[in-house]
């Protein structure tokens, strides 16, 4: 019966096991050959002393190529110097598929490679244990998100990704051919989430792709990303901030508990964030930046440099709240007594924005005026606006970038490292 490398323990000494995997490395010392076999769970040492294995197996081991796929059946022995404290003395080795040489990428990471080179040969890059660890952790992150939101009473939904209207206005849209009509890839599930509040769902969440034709080509931008979105009725921005910070804390706790081995591969030690996360207003963030030499005119978005200065002072996870109404989308609710300020927030990790959210405008007339104030035509939002005429409850929500959450949690230098096959301004293949 097949076992994974991580399941082979010293206390199994004398037992016969079968393993499948890739040849990570071969060391030929003449009368002694070592093969490191790698599967998705780790690496185990296959030891072939000439005197204790068959001539056929020994001969095969000497000529086997790295990254070939093999099956090994043999006896478990204790060996403190070997990975995991065990080795396998094989009675048989079968080459299931031989790899070509030379390899397009060095899986052992002895030879460093630029990220672009790694992405060009992504299938090979993904074999690296450190890279696999990122995606095992990502799997746990998404599982924890679903479990937490389901426990909180949210209903998972899936909204259209082909739309006829820009969610947030602007030109960051990918046009597509949709029979005889003009259509776009959706920037966000925002409009549909809000319509579902009018439908009486009260609490919804979606985990799905978003598409933004942004010109930015930075270490934190993607043109296709996975967004974790919620919308919640009968609450305000403070209510959904509470959900967000508890969700993030739960994700950290679950990853720390269930992904200890993969965190070890990445040499990452997770610190569980404490609740509540610190909160500062937009004005306070401007003051911090100004004190450190970066002046931001009121009403403008905070520059990258300003956010870095604020992040240096705040550290870790924190909220920036009460943004200028004009800097947020048309659906953000302004304060009644200060209409120039919106009931909105961004969740930051250092200088990196992870999430953006707000209480939404739920009053039809106010929403129409807000759309007009942004220079858009209410007629373009017909299906959306109709939902506000027949009993739309007060509601709030947010969108959280899955890749940015993982990037910041693991200290990755580039958000593309958290995506299997990233899409950016210059990359459409693989």
UniProtKB/Swiss-Prot annotation:
It is found in: Cytoplasm. Its cofactor is Mg(2+). One of its GO terms (cellular component) is aminoacyl-tRNA synthetase multienzyme complex. The gene is aspS. This is Aspartate--tRNA(Asp/Asn) ligase. Its main location: cytoplasm. Pfam families: tRNA-synt_2, tRNA_anti-codon. Aspartyl-tRNA synthetase with relaxed tRNA specificity since it is able to aspartylate not only its cognate tRNA(Asp) but also tRNA(Asn). Reaction proceeds in two steps: L-aspartate is first activated by ATP to form Asp-AMP and then transferred to the acceptor end of tRNA(Asp/Asn). HAMAP family: Asp_tRNA_synth_type2. GO terms for biological process: aspartyl-tRNA aminoacylation. GO terms for molecular function: aspartate-tRNA ligase activity; aspartate-tRNA(Asn) ligase activity; ATP binding; magnesium ion binding; RNA binding. Its EC number is 6.1.1.23. Signal peptide: none annotated. ATP binds at residues 212-214, 220-222, 353, 401-404. PANTHER family: ASPARTATE--TRNA LIGASE, CYTOPLASMIC (PTHR43450:SF1), ASPARTYL-TRNA SYNTHETASE (PTHR43450). Residues 190-193 are annotated as: Aspartate. Keywords: Aminoacyl-tRNA synthetase, ATP-binding, Cytoplasm, Ligase, Magnesium, Metal-binding, Nucleotide-binding, Protein biosynthesis. Belongs to the class-II aminoacyl-tRNA synthetase family. Type 2 subfamily. It catalyses: tRNA(Asx) + L-aspartate + ATP = L-aspartyl-tRNA(Asx) + AMP + diphosphate. Homodimer. The record marks 83 as: Important for tRNA non-discrimination. L-aspartate binds at residues 168, 212, 356, 360. Mg(2+) 2 binds at residues 353, 356. The keyword Aminoacyl-tRNA synthetase applies. It comes from the Archaea. Mg(2+) 3 binds at residue 353.
């Amino acid at each position: 019966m097949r076992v994974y490398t991580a399941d082979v323990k010293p206390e199994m000494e004398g037992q016969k096991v079968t393993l499948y995997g890739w040849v990570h490395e071969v060391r030929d010392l003449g009368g002694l050959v070592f093969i490191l076999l790698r599967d998705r769970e780790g690496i185990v040492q296959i030891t072939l002393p000439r005197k204790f294995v068959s001539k056929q197996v020994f001969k095969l081991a000497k000529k086997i190529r790295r990254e070939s796929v093999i099956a090994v059946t043999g006896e478990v022995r204790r060996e403190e110097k070997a990975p995991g404290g065990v080795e396998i003395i094989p009675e048989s080795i079968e080459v299931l598929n031989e790899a070509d040489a030379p390899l397009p990428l060095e899986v052992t990471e002895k030879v460093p490679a630029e990220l672009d080179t790694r992405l060009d040969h992504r299938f090979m890059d993904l074999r690296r244990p450190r890279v696999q660890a990122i995606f095992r952790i990502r799997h746990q992150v998404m599982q924890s998100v679903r479990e937490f939101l389901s426990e909180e009473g949210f209903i998972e939904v899936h909204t259209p990704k082909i739309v006829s209207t820009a969610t947030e206005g602007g030109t960051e849209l990918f046009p597509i051919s949709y029979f005889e009509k003009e259509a776009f890839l959706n920037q966000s599930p925002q409009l549909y989430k809000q319509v579902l509040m009018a439908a009486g769902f009260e609490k919804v969440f979606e985990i799905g792709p978003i598409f933004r034709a942004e010109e930015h080509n930075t270490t934190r931008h993607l043109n296709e990303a996975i967004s974790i979105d919620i919308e919640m009725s009968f609450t305000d921005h403070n209510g959904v901030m509470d959900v967000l910070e508890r969700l993030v804390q739960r994700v950290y706790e679950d990853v720390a508990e269930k992904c200890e081995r993969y965190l070890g591969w990445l040499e990452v030690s997770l610190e569980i964030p404490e609740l509540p996360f610190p909160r500062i207003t937009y004005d306070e963030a401007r003051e911090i930046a100004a004190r450190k030499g970066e002046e931001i005119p009121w009403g403008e978005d905070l520059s990258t440099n300003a956010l870095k200065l604020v992040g240096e002072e705040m550290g870790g996870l924190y909220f920036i709240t009460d943004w200028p109404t004009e800097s947020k989308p048309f659906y953000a609710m302004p304060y009644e007594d200060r209409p120039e300020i919106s009931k909105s927030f961004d969740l930051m990790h250092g200088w990196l924005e992870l999430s953006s959210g707000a209480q939404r405008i739920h009053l039809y007339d106010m929403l129409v005026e807000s759309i007009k104030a942004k220079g858009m035509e209410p007629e373009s939002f017909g299906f959306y606006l109709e939902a506000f005429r027949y009993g739309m409850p007060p509601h709030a929500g947010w969108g959280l970038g899955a890749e940015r959450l993982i990037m910041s949690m693991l200290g990755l230098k580039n958000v593309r490292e958290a995506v299997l096959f990233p899409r950016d301004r210059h990359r459409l293949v693989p």
